[in-house]
Amino acid sequence: MQSSPKVLPKQQMAKFGFNGWTLWALYITGLVMVPILTVATLALFPTENIWPHLLNTTLPRYFRTTVSLMVSVGLGAAVVGTVTAWLIARYRFVGAGWLEWALLMPLAIPAYVGAYALVDLLEYAGPVQTALRGMFGWETARDYWFPEIRSFPAACFVLTFALYPYVYLLARAAFRDQSSASDDVAKSLGRGAFARFWRIGLPLARPAIAAGAAIVMMETVNDFGTVDYFAVQTLTTGIFSVWLQSGNAGGAAQLACVILAVIILLVSLEKSARRRMKFFNLSTWHRGVEKTQLTGRRGVIAFTLCALPVVIGFVIPTSVLGWHALNHLDEWTNPALIKALLNTLRVATIAALITVFAGVVMVYGVRLARSETPKRLLPITSIGYAAPGAVLGVGILIPLAWFDNRLADGIWELTGHDIGLILTGTSAAIIYAYCVRFFAIAQGAADAAMGRVSPNLANAARSLGRNRLQTLKEVYLPLMSGSVGSALLLVFVDCVKELPATLLLRPFNYNTLATLVHEQASLENLSQAAPASLYIICVGLLAALLLAKTNK
């Protein structure tokens, strides 16, 4: 009896449309999804189920506060971003040129840094209240009324002026892309500037504004430093309380799942809005709206409306921190600051390189696959960017701690040598969290760049005897270098600014710039937090300048 021919692994993979690159893409997908799957598993099968207790006590309050904060900041950012985008896109006035990119500068400052600066400026012992007491002869806080600084409205205020550039960026592009035809018709019917904005410009830009507002709300849910400093109890602060104070990982995972449900809803809203954005340029003839010159009082009003968000979101926080830094120059040589700076540069650089490398490999592997399965998995990996850092912290620490302990126990039994915790006891866990959190940035940049390369170039390289790796190195990468470089910068900047995941995953006595700022500000030592904050702002400005350059 003749035996059937032996099927080799490569032949089996080819049968299903897979190859080595495709398998690497699947491995990367699995690594990105591990934290999310861990959170879901731990929430469904907790060691100690405190869900009924959470449901009857703190969860409703956490949820109400989170939704209220999310909606308030989303609406505030939508108003600020839309008004400034309309003025920049449709009018010419003194200062409009530099305000066009200056309106992006608040993105350089993490919201928690802006919160620390605002409190320092406006608190009872701050310069504003001190000046008021001196001016009017007031002696104590009972002699006058002043808004409570560490409060829910203050958190909304800070987050709004830190995050509005997301709306501004998308709305400005939408207003610019609108055809002049509808605007000309409205003018011929005698409609004024406000009527044209309200009846034509705003409805056409609504999908872009909704997409920007959804991103703002996702960032609001992710925020920890601001709400923690203002004592606003949200779902994110609840994760820290339940896990670190109560020691219940299952309860923290259940709260994390609630956050994920909110995030999935927001992502769906953002995706739906982006799909509707395609109606902007359906006309075969397209001419942009010509800008109107504003002079006199109208020009001053337009300048003021556009300059105010820059002053609140960037100038004031930077000035407060700069004043502290200049008055405490010795803090710049503080060993703790230098160590935190080196830690930040190391983990952010490693994470950026790994993330972008993995993004390129995954996109290339998916493109080489003849099966549709890997292509369907590609959008799933972007969930890490939507998931808050606190959620990823829960999903990463638990499996890594389990692996660390098993590995250490096994090596101890075999060799009698204690290797310690090689993942959770070092910065490896932080780097992994950064890679998962910002993988979507690298993947999106690689996918867009690779999509612009003609398949004929790759086919020509293969016909000349180049293998898949050589084709990637000699054809794709040189043509993708600009996008890859931008992705490296954006991932690096986001890693420097990331706070929640770093707080949960850092080893003992390990600080990055973000955690050092949070630590010192929590102790009311803003003078010690100022140099680290300014380092973060300088790095963030690189990303803001890149966005300004790529969105001219």
Segments (PLM) and residue ranges:
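Short, charged juxtamembrane terminal tails flanking transmembrane helices
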Residues: 3, 549-552
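Glycine-rich helix-loop "coupling/hinge" segments at transmembrane-helix boundaries
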Residues: 221-246, 497-526
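Membrane-water interface segments at the C-terminal ends of transmembrane alpha-helices
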Residues: 16-47, 57-176, 204-224, 252-271, ...
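Membrane-topology segments of multi-pass transport proteins
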Residues: 1-20, 51-53, 134-139, 247, ...
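Membrane-interface interhelical loops and short amphipathic "cap" helices
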Residues: 48-62, 228-230, 236-250, 325-337, ...
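Internal metal/ion-chelating core segments
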Residues: 188-194, 198-281, 286
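Feature of multi-pass inner-membrane transport and sensor proteins
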Residues: 2-7, 132, 179-180, 195, ...
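Short helix-to-coil transition segments within interhelical loops
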Residues: 55, 91, 175-205, 232, ...
